[in-house]
């Protein structure tokens, strides 16, 4: 397959789209093609590979072992092609084109506002924003899937990072919570803790705090988003550890309160992260400079 790659770049893009969506129809919609056209291209790729790349299990489309292996190579090639385009743009001093940014879910509360300001100054930029949990973002960094990332706890490698702004983590409760005095984690052992899914940065931090303090919560409820957790806390379902950046409005109008817990807030930081060795186009370099400048004014 690799020796045919220069003649079949579009086929690789189609294969990548189907692998991401695990759906021919959704991939076709993204690419602006018909579903039969996408299916035909996949059949041609399978003929070149000499192995089936997808298998249908009932109504679910899955990658075969061959498909999974090929996908890694295809994404490496597509990333290299993208980097080559950016290198050529850099030589031309181009400050437009596509810019793909990934942010952890907690950062979605402030990242769109910053990106809106940036794109106003760079109207030629086609901006793509991907929101995911920490574990998924780490996978994207490893795969060189996007240009840059914003996250709270960056990997040690293979990435370079720059500190952006403070990200204090606090314990919050509904406004009618009875106890607000100085608390220890043992005082909270009778509470219901609302937590994100495994792989989330806040979930990892909360579990570490519980382990460090030897606390076994009375009850834990898992939820898939910070927004759902905030609504549940305001409804009195329990308490949660969240980034203060995610709830400025709720705190200002008194819907949530910060509990006075010993050892909190935990002072963390936001970082902009770039995969080590990645060539940044001028527009990406401009974005990094903008984010650093914006952080200094926060």
Curated annotation (Swiss-Prot):
Task: Report keywords, A-Z.
Answer: Activator, DNA-binding, Transcription, Transcription regulation
Domain HTH lysR-type, by residue range, is 7-64
Q: Which Pfam families match?
A: HTH_1, LysR_substrate
- Source superkingdom: Bacteria
What Gene Ontology molecular function terms does this protein carry? DNA-binding transcription factor activity; transcription cis-regulatory region binding
Residue intervals annotated as DNA-binding region are 24-43
Functional summary from the UniProt entry: Transcriptional activator for the cbb operon for RuBisCO and other Calvin cycle genes.
Family label: Belongs to the LysR transcriptional regulatory family.
Annotated protein name in UniProt: HTH-type transcriptional regulator CbbR
Q: Which gene encodes it?
A: cbbR
């Amino acid at each position: 397959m690799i020796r045919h790659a220069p003649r079949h770049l579009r086929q690789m893009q189609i294969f990548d789209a189907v692998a991401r969506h695990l759906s021919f129809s959704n991939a076709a919609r993204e690419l602006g093609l018909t579903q039969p056209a996408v299916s035909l291209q996949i059949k041609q790729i399978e003929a070149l590979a000499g192995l089936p790349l997808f298998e249908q299990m009932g109504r679910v489309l899955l990658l075969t072992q061959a498909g999974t292996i090929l996908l890694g190579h295809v994404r490496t090639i597509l990333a290299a092609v993208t980097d080559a385009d950016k290198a050529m743009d850099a030589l031309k001093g181009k400050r437009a084109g596509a810019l793909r940014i990934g942010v952890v879910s907690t950062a979605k509360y402030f990242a769109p506002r910053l990106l809106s300001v940036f794109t106003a100054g760079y109207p030629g930029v086609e901006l793509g924003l991907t929101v995911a949990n920490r574990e998924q973002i780490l996978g994207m960094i490893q795969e060189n899937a996007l240009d840059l990332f914003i996250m709270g706890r960056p990997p040690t490698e293979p990435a370079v990072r720059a500190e952006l702004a403070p990200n204090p983590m606090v314990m919050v409760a509904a406004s009618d919570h009875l106890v607000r005095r100085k608390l220890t984690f043992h005082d909270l052992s009778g509470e219901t803790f609302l937590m994100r899914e495994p792989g989330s940065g806040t979930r990892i931090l909360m579990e570490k705090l519980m382990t460090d303090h030897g606390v076994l919560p009375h009850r834990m409820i898992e939820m898939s988003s910070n927004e759902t957790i905030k609504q549940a806390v305001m409804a009195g379902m329990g308490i949660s550890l969240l980034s203060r950046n995610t709830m400025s409005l709720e705190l200002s109008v008194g819907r949530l309160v910060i509990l006075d817990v010993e050892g909190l807030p935990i002072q963390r930081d936001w970082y902009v992260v770039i995969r080590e060795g990645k060539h940044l186009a001028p527009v990406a370099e401009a974005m990094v400079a903008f984010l650093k400048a914006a952080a200094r004014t926060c």
